[in-house]
Amino acid sequence: MARFKAVNMSPRFLPVVLEQQLVPGTFEYALHALIDSEFDLSVLAAKFRNDETGAPAYDPAVMLKIVLLAYSRGLVSSRAIERVCAENVLFMAISGDTQPAYTTIAAFVRGLSDEITAIFTEVILICDRQGLIGRQMFAIDGVKLPSNASKAKSGTHAELAHQAQAIERRVKSMLKEHRKRDRRSEQGQHPDLAAERASRQERLDALKSDAKSIRAFLQSNAQRRSGKGPERKSNLTDNDSAKMATGKGVIQGYTGAATVDASHQIIVAAQAHGSGSEQSLLIPMIEQARAFATAQTVMTADAGYHSEANLKQLSEQAIPALIADGLMRRRDARFKGQDKYKTGPDPLYDKRPAPKPAGSGKFRPEDFAYDSQKNTCICPAGKRLYSSGQHCTTNGRTHHKFKGTKRDCVPCALRDQCLRTPETTPIRQVAFFHKGLASPLRHTEAMKRRIDSAAGRALYARRIATVEPVFGNLRYNKRLDRFTLRGQPKVDTQWKLYCMVHNIEKLAHHGYAQ
């Protein structure tokens, strides 16, 4: 019979040299060397006043190492970070075997709001000294992530006031019903009556508390307005966050925006914004990144950041830029026929309506018989549309507008080919723009010419390969799937910490401190 060496699982006292656990070339080694030799954390140390009295505090440098190492391993929960500090030898090594409580870790991250920008900038400056910033092209983009906020507790001030009124009416109705039930109940016949009353009172107290919190919120918070004027929805749990439409549905969260250098994918600017509008983020992100740019650095962004106002401001400040518009790919022959390669939506996650089958294109204006001399328009079904305006203006361009009638459009057999949403749209409208008119969007037309040139297309094509791998690294490798804090300053701190992890990882890959 075969014989094997015995397996002894009894306790062992094994010598571990903590410093030897930090191997050159790894992220943790670069992080340890970077914070100990490069960072000036005196501003964090100045927060403590325990020189003569009070217990010793955890070193801010050690706390920063722990948090950044945890984020690099996909650990964001302060309780999970506390656990690995006690169990993982790598965390023991980088912290000198200190084991801060989860409350200490959470308080440290929350308290970095005022200092995080300076610390983040220090990492960028070190990347620059290592020659990792090329300054030829910066790519700007953002990722929308859920936050620690309830999507159900959001709405305009009018909607929240209506919600409070509905809760108060429900409380009155419940009180009235409870009094009736109590009068019908005879003493001693219901042994559980006291417990039932306690349960009722608990529900009533919860409803009253909800209504009271909504009323207090409305009194202490003004209406939120978008840049274009309409009221934005407020949120009771985190009023800095916003409702945002994504490919996976609507979320309550923040946009984590980043400006990335094309040379080695170093993040040169990062900011978390409680807004789903990307157009409003373009200029602030460029302003943050200009400290690391030159006069020749080209700023690139996708169509979400495109607006005439943004392009005008870039032109006035003489900032080289390539900002795509919504029709850029349609003008590019390389993308002709790309729709046949698109996969269908995932019914479990994608809540958008299924795309129309191939060959189901809608009627376009050229399918209508328009006679400018006789002022008439005949639809593909042979019905006459009536004129609803000869000199209408849209984006500065003049056009002649026609409308159908319910009498003709509702029973029409071609509704599905004519209307985008035939189930909700009763009639078809069509506009014919006057020919030969110059576009009033002067800066947009200039950007189109620039981005459609051979040089513009070649340079813009590098944008997606510059910025998308950064978000892929943060979201999937580092498992950043949501922000865990509330309030824009704290969420911005968490976003910058993750961006620091990415930059330090780049330093480690390029031989920092070896």
Which functions belong to the PLM regions below?
Residues 1-29:
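Hydrophobic alpha-helical membrane-insertion signals
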Residues 4-6, 67, 74-87, 96-514:
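Anion-binding and metal-coordination hotspots
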Residues 24-68:
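Basic, short loop/linker segments at the boundary and entry of helix-turn-helix/winged-helix-like folds
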